[in-house]
Protein backbone atom coordinates (compact mmCIF):
# COMPACT_ATOMS: atom_id res chain seq x y z
CA UNK A 1 0.00 0.00 0.00
CA UNK A 2 1.22 3.43 -0.78
CA UNK A 3 2.37 5.48 2.24
CA UNK A 4 0.23 8.43 3.24
CA UNK A 5 1.92 11.76 3.00
CA UNK A 6 2.29 13.55 6.26
CA UNK A 7 0.58 16.89 6.31
CA UNK A 8 3.02 19.75 5.94
CA UNK A 9 3.71 21.66 9.11
CA UNK A 10 2.30 25.11 9.17
CA UNK A 11 4.90 27.75 9.78
CA UNK A 12 3.99 30.04 12.63
CA UNK A 13 5.45 33.52 12.67
CA UNK A 14 6.19 34.84 16.11
CA UNK A 15 5.78 38.59 16.30
CA UNK A 16 7.23 40.28 19.32
CA UNK A 17 5.69 43.58 20.29
CA UNK A 18 8.15 46.43 20.40
CA UNK A 19 8.28 48.53 23.50
CA UNK A 20 7.40 52.14 22.81
CA UNK A 21 10.39 54.40 22.77
CA UNK A 22 10.70 56.37 26.02
CA UNK A 23 9.59 59.96 25.80
CA UNK A 24 12.39 62.45 26.10
CA UNK A 25 12.55 63.89 29.58
CA UNK A 26 11.40 67.46 29.95
CA UNK A 27 14.24 69.86 30.26
CA UNK A 28 14.41 71.45 33.67
CA UNK A 29 14.39 75.18 33.78
CA UNK A 30 17.89 76.48 33.78
CA UNK A 31 18.85 77.89 37.15
CA UNK A 32 20.93 81.05 37.21
CA UNK A 33 24.58 80.42 37.85
CA UNK A 34 25.84 81.13 41.33
CA UNK A 35 27.10 84.67 41.50
CA UNK A 36 24.94 85.88 38.61
CA UNK A 37 22.96 89.12 39.10
CA UNK A 38 19.67 87.18 39.25
CA UNK A 39 21.00 84.70 41.83
CA UNK A 40 22.48 87.48 43.97
CA UNK A 41 19.25 89.49 43.90
CA UNK A 42 17.19 86.39 44.72
CA UNK A 43 19.46 85.54 47.65
CA UNK A 44 19.27 89.14 48.89
CA UNK A 45 15.47 88.97 48.91
CA UNK A 46 15.50 85.72 50.87
CA UNK A 47 18.11 87.09 53.28
CA UNK A 48 16.03 90.16 54.10
CA UNK A 49 12.88 88.08 54.30
CA UNK A 50 14.52 85.96 57.00
CA UNK A 51 16.91 88.32 58.80
CA UNK A 52 15.06 91.64 58.55
CA UNK A 53 11.42 90.56 58.74
CA UNK A 54 11.65 87.12 60.43
CA UNK A 55 9.68 85.40 57.66
CA UNK A 56 10.17 82.51 55.30
CA UNK A 57 8.73 81.72 51.87
CA UNK A 58 5.74 79.96 53.42
CA UNK A 59 4.69 82.57 55.98
CA UNK A 60 5.59 85.71 53.98
CA UNK A 61 2.72 87.96 52.94
CA UNK A 62 2.65 89.97 49.72
CA UNK A 63 3.69 93.03 51.74
CA UNK A 64 6.67 91.09 53.14
CA UNK A 65 7.78 90.24 49.59
CA UNK A 66 7.51 93.91 48.64
CA UNK A 67 9.54 95.04 51.66
CA UNK A 68 12.24 92.41 51.07
CA UNK A 69 12.48 93.33 47.37
CA UNK A 70 12.83 97.01 48.27
CA UNK A 71 15.58 96.19 50.76
CA UNK A 72 17.45 94.10 48.17
CA UNK A 73 17.34 97.00 45.71
CA UNK A 74 18.23 99.47 48.47
CA UNK A 75 21.40 97.50 49.30
CA UNK A 76 22.76 98.14 45.82
CA UNK A 77 21.56 101.74 45.81
CA UNK A 78 23.25 102.56 49.13
CA UNK A 79 26.57 101.16 47.91
CA UNK A 80 26.42 103.61 45.00
CA UNK A 81 25.19 106.36 47.33
CA UNK A 82 28.25 105.97 49.58
CA UNK A 83 30.57 106.08 46.55
CA UNK A 84 28.81 109.18 45.19
CA UNK A 85 28.97 111.09 48.47
CA UNK A 86 32.63 110.12 48.97
CA UNK A 87 33.48 111.52 45.53
CA UNK A 88 31.60 114.73 46.27
CA UNK A 89 33.45 115.14 49.58
CA UNK A 90 36.89 114.46 48.08
CA UNK A 91 36.32 117.03 45.32
CA UNK A 92 34.73 119.57 47.67
CA UNK A 93 31.96 120.13 45.12
CA UNK A 94 29.27 122.75 45.21
CA UNK A 95 25.77 121.41 45.63
CA UNK A 96 22.31 122.39 44.48
CA UNK A 97 19.87 122.64 47.41
CA UNK A 98 16.27 122.23 46.29
CA UNK A 99 13.54 123.22 48.76
CA UNK A 100 9.92 122.19 48.32
CA UNK A 101 6.92 121.75 50.60
CA UNK A 102 5.84 118.66 48.68
CA UNK A 103 7.30 115.80 46.65
CA UNK A 104 5.09 113.43 44.68
CA UNK A 105 7.43 110.45 44.44
CA UNK A 106 5.19 107.87 42.77
CA UNK A 107 6.10 104.17 42.78
CA UNK A 108 9.58 104.24 44.24
CA UNK A 109 10.39 100.52 43.83
CA UNK A 110 9.72 100.31 40.10
CA UNK A 111 11.38 103.68 39.46
CA UNK A 112 14.53 102.65 41.32
CA UNK A 113 14.69 99.26 39.59
CA UNK A 114 14.57 101.01 36.21
CA UNK A 115 17.19 103.59 37.19
CA UNK A 116 19.48 100.91 38.61
CA UNK A 117 18.84 98.76 35.51
CA UNK A 118 17.62 95.94 37.74
CA UNK A 119 14.04 95.56 36.54
CA UNK A 120 14.69 92.42 34.46
CA UNK A 121 16.91 91.01 37.20
CA UNK A 122 14.23 91.56 39.85
CA UNK A 123 11.53 90.10 37.59
CA UNK A 124 13.54 86.91 37.04
CA UNK A 125 14.55 86.62 40.71
CA UNK A 126 10.98 86.96 41.96
CA UNK A 127 9.71 84.53 39.31
CA UNK A 128 12.08 81.89 40.70
CA UNK A 129 10.52 82.50 44.11
CA UNK A 130 6.99 82.14 42.74
CA UNK A 131 6.22 85.87 42.82
CA UNK A 132 5.26 88.40 40.17
CA UNK A 133 6.99 91.78 40.21
CA UNK A 134 3.91 93.72 39.12
CA UNK A 135 1.77 92.23 41.89
CA UNK A 136 4.51 92.77 44.46
CA UNK A 137 4.93 96.41 43.37
CA UNK A 138 1.19 96.97 43.81
CA UNK A 139 1.74 96.67 47.58
CA UNK A 140 3.50 100.04 47.64
CA UNK A 141 1.51 102.88 49.16
CA UNK A 142 2.13 106.40 47.90
CA UNK A 143 4.38 108.46 50.12
CA UNK A 144 2.29 111.11 51.83
CA UNK A 145 4.67 113.90 50.85
CA UNK A 146 2.70 115.77 48.22
CA UNK A 147 -0.15 115.77 45.78
CA UNK A 148 -0.26 117.64 42.51
CA UNK A 149 1.85 119.05 39.71
CA UNK A 150 4.34 120.98 41.82
CA UNK A 151 5.11 117.92 43.93
CA UNK A 152 5.63 115.80 40.82
CA UNK A 153 7.84 118.49 39.30
CA UNK A 154 10.00 118.56 42.43
CA UNK A 155 10.46 114.77 42.33
CA UNK A 156 11.37 114.92 38.61
CA UNK A 157 13.94 117.63 39.30
CA UNK A 158 15.68 115.39 41.83
CA UNK A 159 15.71 112.48 39.36
CA UNK A 160 17.14 114.72 36.64
CA UNK A 161 19.86 116.18 38.87
CA UNK A 162 21.05 112.68 39.81
CA UNK A 163 20.93 111.50 36.18
CA UNK A 164 23.02 114.50 35.09
CA UNK A 165 25.58 113.79 37.87
CA UNK A 166 24.88 117.15 39.51
CA UNK A 167 25.50 117.06 43.29
CA UNK A 168 22.19 117.98 44.91
CA UNK A 169 20.14 117.59 48.07
CA UNK A 170 16.38 118.02 48.26
CA UNK A 171 14.83 119.38 51.45
CA UNK A 172 11.25 118.94 52.61
CA UNK A 173 8.97 118.05 55.51
CA UNK A 174 8.53 114.56 56.92
CA UNK A 175 4.74 114.57 57.08
CA UNK A 176 3.11 111.95 59.27
CA UNK A 177 -0.34 112.56 57.79
CA UNK A 178 0.49 114.27 54.52
CA UNK A 179 -2.74 113.36 52.70
CA UNK A 180 -6.23 112.23 53.65
CA UNK A 181 -8.65 109.57 52.52
CA UNK A 182 -12.26 110.31 51.66
CA UNK A 183 -15.06 108.08 52.87
CA UNK A 184 -18.83 108.40 52.98
CA UNK A 185 -20.93 108.05 56.12
CA UNK A 186 -24.71 108.55 56.13
CA UNK A 187 -24.54 110.22 52.75
CA UNK A 188 -21.88 112.70 53.81
CA UNK A 189 -18.25 112.97 52.77
CA UNK A 190 -15.84 112.38 55.62
CA UNK A 191 -12.10 113.03 55.58
CA UNK A 192 -9.87 110.55 57.39
CA UNK A 193 -6.15 111.04 58.03
CA UNK A 194 -4.02 108.72 55.92
CA UNK A 195 -1.08 107.37 57.93
CA UNK A 196 1.24 106.34 55.11
CA UNK A 197 3.87 105.20 57.62
CA UNK A 198 1.61 102.63 59.32
CA UNK A 199 3.55 99.72 57.76
CA UNK A 200 6.92 101.50 57.74
CA UNK A 201 8.72 102.48 54.56
CA UNK A 202 11.94 100.75 53.47
CA UNK A 203 13.30 103.78 51.61
CA UNK A 204 13.49 106.06 54.65
CA UNK A 205 16.79 106.23 56.55
CA UNK A 206 16.68 107.96 59.94
CA UNK A 207 19.62 110.26 60.72
CA UNK A 208 19.39 111.10 64.45
CA UNK A 209 23.06 112.16 64.57
CA UNK A 210 22.20 115.15 62.35
CA UNK A 211 19.33 116.41 64.51
CA UNK A 212 19.18 120.13 65.27
CA UNK A 213 17.49 122.25 67.93
CA UNK A 214 14.92 124.73 66.60
CA UNK A 215 14.09 127.67 68.93
CA UNK A 216 10.53 129.01 68.95
CA UNK A 217 8.91 132.01 70.65
CA UNK A 218 11.12 133.78 73.21
CA UNK A 219 12.37 137.34 73.10
CA UNK A 220 15.38 139.18 71.73
CA UNK A 221 17.96 140.27 74.29
CA UNK A 222 20.13 143.19 73.21
CA UNK A 223 23.62 143.75 74.56
CA UNK A 224 27.01 145.22 73.72
CA UNK A 225 30.23 143.21 73.64
CA UNK A 226 33.70 144.30 74.85
CA UNK A 227 34.43 146.00 71.53
CA UNK A 228 31.26 148.02 71.59
CA UNK A 229 29.47 145.93 68.95
CA UNK A 230 25.73 145.52 69.23
CA UNK A 231 24.60 141.91 69.87
CA UNK A 232 21.15 140.37 69.71
CA UNK A 233 20.33 137.01 71.30
CA UNK A 234 17.10 135.02 71.28
CA UNK A 235 16.38 133.90 74.84
CA UNK A 236 13.59 132.24 76.84
CA UNK A 237 12.66 130.05 73.89
CA UNK A 238 10.77 126.79 73.61
CA UNK A 239 12.78 124.34 71.56
CA UNK A 240 11.87 121.54 69.21
CA UNK A 241 14.15 118.93 67.72
CA UNK A 242 14.41 118.59 63.96
CA UNK A 243 15.27 114.98 63.06
CA UNK A 244 16.20 114.27 59.42
CA UNK A 245 15.16 111.28 57.34
CA UNK A 246 16.95 110.59 54.04
CA UNK A 247 15.55 109.02 50.88
CA UNK A 248 18.24 108.02 48.32
CA UNK A 249 17.56 109.27 44.78
CA UNK A 250 19.23 107.28 41.99
CA UNK A 251 19.87 108.72 38.55
CA UNK A 252 19.23 106.65 35.44
CA UNK A 253 21.84 103.90 35.02
CA UNK A 254 22.79 104.49 38.65
CA UNK A 255 25.53 106.94 37.72
CA UNK A 256 24.94 109.10 40.82
CA UNK A 257 22.83 108.74 43.93
CA UNK A 258 21.80 111.96 45.67
CA UNK A 259 19.25 112.15 48.48
CA UNK A 260 16.11 113.89 49.67
CA UNK A 261 16.24 115.00 53.31
CA UNK A 262 12.92 115.30 55.16
CA UNK A 263 12.69 116.96 58.56
CA UNK A 264 10.53 115.56 61.35
CA UNK A 265 9.68 117.56 64.48
CA UNK A 266 10.15 115.98 67.91
CA UNK A 267 9.83 117.28 71.45
CA UNK A 268 13.15 118.46 72.85
Regions found by a protein language model. Name each.
Residues 2-268:
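A conserved ligand/cofactor-binding region detector
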